[in-house]
């Protein structure tokens, strides 16, 4: 009897371990633009998902893409209505929103999720095709206009901040900028550049993702940051530049 109980317990343990092993969460696959395009071309039925804002989508997007704004109130309900048996290819501007969206898709049961590394910014930089019905490459500030603004502040450090209304880390940094300006005793001038409304400047300054920050002194770019930068780190960098 004891032997039977032992065997039964062993079988139960093996089944439990097997069940745990097969219960691992699904993960999305990250692909570079070239591989992303190649796989899209060879895939049969699939969903191509652009998770940027409608405004961003209207300017430039991949052919055949469906737009569901990751930050939209209806994001979860809309992706919940998609066919979970089809592979999903997802992208955004530079990869932040698409990575989060890919995680959400796998969490709700999509088993084949592919996310584009570097987003549409990298896609365009590598000369892959886009649809651009409403895109005006010349709108917004020119490089010459920006340079004039920088040169006009010769006695200060100039911080050029590329941001967007939908960018969470951009908002976080914008909130502490007034305090940073005060800490720098009037020696810091901040120029905000909206990423979506200044495409020619984005291209000229080679901004691939946001937030993007540049520090200028005497009209010369001294330091560049990609991504969120803590207030204290910026203060240290600015103080270093201000030292005689």
Identify the meaning behind each predicted range.
Residues 3-6, 20-46, 54-87, 97-155, ...:
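Rhodanese-like catalytic fold shared by cysteine-dependent sulfurtransferases
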């Amino acid at each position: 009897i004891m032997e039977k109980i032992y065997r039964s317990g062993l079988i139960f343990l093996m089944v439990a371990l097997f069940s745990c092993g097969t219960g691992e969460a699904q993960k999305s696959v990250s692909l570079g633009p070239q591989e992303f395009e190649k796989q899209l071309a060879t895939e049969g039925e699939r969903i191509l998902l652009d998770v940027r804002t409608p405004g961003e989508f209207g300017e430039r997007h991949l052919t055949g893409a469906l737009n569901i704004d990751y930050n939209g109130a209806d994001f979860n309900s809309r992706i919940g209505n998609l066919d979970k048996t089809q592979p999903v290819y997802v992208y955004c501007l530079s990869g932040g929103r698409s990575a989060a969206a890919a995680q959400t898709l796998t969490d709700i049961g999509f088993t084949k999720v592919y996310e584009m590394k570097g987003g549409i910014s990298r896609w365009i930089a590598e000369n892959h095709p886009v649809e651009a019905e409403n895109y005006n490459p010349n709108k917004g500030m020119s490089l010459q206009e920006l340079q004039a603004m920088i040169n006009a502040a010769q006695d200060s450090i100039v911080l050029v901040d590329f941001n967007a209304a939908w960018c969470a880390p951009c908002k976080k940094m914008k909130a502490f900028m007034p305090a940073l300006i005060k800490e720098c005793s009037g020696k810091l001038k901040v120029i905000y550049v909206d990423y979506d409304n200044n495409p020619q400047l984005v291209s000229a300054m080679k901004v691939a993702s946001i937030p993007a920050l540049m520090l200028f002194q005497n009209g010369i770019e001294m330091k560049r940051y990609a991504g969120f930068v803590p207030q204290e780190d910026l203060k240290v960098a600015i103080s270093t530049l201000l030292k005689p």
